[in-house]
Swiss-Prot record:
Name of this chain's protein: Uncharacterized protein Atu1656
Family annotation (InterPro entries): 6-blade_b-propeller_TolB-like (IPR011042), PD40 (IPR011659)
Lineage of producing organism: Bacteria, Pseudomonadati, Pseudomonadota, Alphaproteobacteria, Hyphomicrobiales
Cross-referenced SUPFAM superfamilies: DPP6 N-terminal domain-like
A Pfam entry, by short name: PD40
Assigned protein family: Belongs to the TolB family.
Organism this protein belongs to: Agrobacterium fabrum (strain C58 / ATCC 33970) (Agrobacterium tumefaciens (strain C58))
Gene3D superfamilies for this protein: TolB, C-terminal domain
Length: 293
């Protein structure tokens, strides 16, 4: 990978080990707080609907971190699914976890399991599929599916298991997440050459460009309050969404207005791949990575 002129790749410690810092940023007060730090690699925090814990992945497994008292990780029983990636989330009622795991087929498949733990239930027959967001009513979810090497956005009705294709092969389409009113799915797409933020109606009927920036914009997450979207931006010369780079964490209005850089951090892949807002929409969780000295 060619080094960026703005952001420089940093070296890691012995053996490439990293320190994960799970943090929370308040968009109203502009204050940050550290929840927990560890020498292990943790990724993609989801905030529980009751506001009590974060759900993250590490080494193929899921863990809960309490936001009250001792934040030491509690492993979730995911049954046979032991190669979970960072595309996971919690249903709006808190009863289900969605995971993306490749143990069964050697490719990422989407499963649902009780949030109390248990045997995962396969949802996607077409593979690979990477989960990214729940609909506000909890009746469907959206995901990135790769079919014949084409990246597109899909949704699935949970009861029927019917897969609906929402985008149609224009560039790479990835990272979808629902708006809180359930009318739009925000996603990132390279259809114009540079990865930017777009949105599509939940029935696929209309696609709109949201960002027009000089960066590679990834993983848009609309806030539950319906006024802001948080996302990660790489330098324009960075392909895909690698880890171990300085990236910008950006905030904007739902229509793409008032884009602002909140802060830079060392991370990228794993920082905020899946929904990460607090239930009230005032805060979001993310992971910052530090080289181990």
């Amino acid at each position: 990978m060619r080094q960026s002129t703005l952001h420089t790749r940093l070296s890691t410690g012995p053996g490439g080990s990293m320190r994960s810092s799970i943090e929370i940023f308040n968009i109203r007060t502009r204050k940050m707080r550290v929840v927990w730090q560890t020498p292990e690699l943790f990724e993609a925090p989801n905030w529980s609907p009751d506001g009590k814990y974060l759900l993250l992945n590490s080494e193929g497994l899921l863990y809960r971190l309490s936001l009250a008292g001792d934040p030491s990780p509690e492993k979730v029983d995911t049954g046979f699914a032991t190669i979970c990636n960072n595309d996971h989330g919690i249903s709006p009622d808190g009863a289900l976890y969605a995971i993306s795991d490749k143990v069964e087929f050697g490719k990422s498949a989407i499963y649902l399991l009780p949030s109390t733990g248990g045997t995962p239930r396969l949802m996607t027959k077409n593979l690979p599929s990477y989960w990214h967001g729940w609909s506000p009513d909890g009746k469907s979810f959206t995901y990135c599916g790769i079919r014949d090497q084409v990246f597109d956005i899909y949704s699935m009705d949970i009861d029927s298991g019917v897969e609906t294709r929402l985008t149609h092969g224009e560039g790479r389409n990835d990272g979808p997440d629902y708006s809180p009113d359930g009318r739009w799915i925000y996603f990132n797409s390279s259809r114009t050459g540079q990865m930017q933020i777009w949105r599509v109606r939940v029935d696929g009927s209309s696609v709109e460009r949201i960002t027009d920036s000089a960066y590679g914009d990834w993983f848009p997450h609309p806030s539950p309050s319906g006024d802001k979207v948080v996302f990660v931006s790489y330098d324009a010369d960075v392909f895909d969404h690698p880890r171990d780079l300085d990236v910008r964490v950006q905030l904007m209005d739902m229509d793409g207005g008032n884009v602002e850089t909140l802060f830079d951090l060392f991370g990228g892949q794993g920082t905020m791949n899946s929904p990460n807002w607090s239930p009230d929409g005032d805060e979001f969780a993310y992971v910052r990575y530090f080289p181990v000295e």
